[in-house]
Amino acid sequence: MNLLKHMNWAGDSKIYPEVMDELGIPDASGWDKGAFEREVGRLNPAQRANWDAVYGPMNEEFKKAFPNMTEKEKMQWRYQRYMQDYLGTIEAVDENVGRVLDYLEQNNLMENTIIVYTSDQGFYLGEHGWFDKRFVYDESFKTPLLVAWPGKVEAGSRVDEMVQNLDFAQTFLEAAGIPAPSDMQGE
């Protein structure tokens, strides 16, 4: 999905539909403006207050800057907004994985725990002018997979073999000493 042509203002950049209307911004991606309210409408009042505390001031700043932005500046702004959200998500995941690891360490469970950190696929972060994950290029095939398995995986080791998440269940069953059903896929 192309940064310039397909990234939508409301969904990807968190611009409120009323701000888009006020500025006369058509949503070129065809995204339903009502979808924004359906999404944030699922938030409870405390969550919505947090959402508005973060994105409200950003929307106000955007309203002031938008009329004087060039097309290139608009694209750069959208990209930065998208990346800030993405990196904020990464930071939150990192902090919470750290909390889980701290708990395991504090409760002497690290030596008896297999830790797997992965994702569903790779992601475009501006490469080829794209965002998201929908095209068959190298970036979308690079799925992160980190494993800590005491006594099985040496710390700092790297394996270049192809792995599929289809194999995870088989691996965990084998580690637990449980035979896999004969009709189960994976290795």
PLM segments and residue spans:
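Active-site-proximal cap/lid insertion segments
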Residues: 1-162, 175-183
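Zinc-coordinating Cys/His ligand positions in small cysteine/histidine-rich zinc-finger domains
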Residues: 165, 169
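FAD-dinucleotide binding site
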Residues: 187
